[in-house]
Amino acid sequence: MRRVGFIVNPIAGMGGAVGLKGTDGDEILERAVKLGAERVSLRRAEEFLRALGVVAQTIEFWTCPDGMGEEAFLRAGVRCTVIPGRRGKTCAEDTKQAARYMLEHNLDIIVFFGGDGTARDILDSVDMKIPVLGVPSGVKMQSGV
């Protein structure tokens, strides 16, 4: 059975739908929420899991608590192992710690949902030691994700 790490940046892409250029920083995030922004990356993660259908049953998923992954699995009805991590409001360091944890536990691949910042955080944490698949979920994607 393949072991897949699954990381969601819960605030990636929120600013786009409300005319902002991202959600970098607490002030901009707060403004996006007030303007009615929704969690784009979480929705994409859930859609990804649902699209796998019965194939998801053949994969051992490892994910982060709450909005960094667990919530998508609960919504999609897919089983997963929740790794140690912060619940509630998270930051880039939580993403880095999760990626390192997945690398240390020899997962086959990390799939992440986020933008350029999330891509950089994961690359900084795992270098090229594990395959990484990015599902673009940011507002202003500039990287090759």
Spans of model-derived segments:
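Short glycine-rich anion-binding loops that position phosphate/pyrophosphate groups of nucleotides
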Residues: 10-11, 116-117, 138
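Short glycine-/acidic-enriched loop or helix-start segments at secondary-structure transitions
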Residues: 16-17, 73, 121-123, 144
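ATP/NTP phosphate-donor binding region
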Residues: 1-108
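Short, acidic/small-residue loops that bind anionic groups at enzyme active sites
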Residues: 109, 113, 122-145
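A broadly conserved amphipathic alpha-helix scaffold signal in soluble, globular proteins
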Residues: 100-103, 120-124
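Glycine-rich beta-strand-to-loop/alpha-helix junction loops that act as flexible
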Residues: 65, 113-116
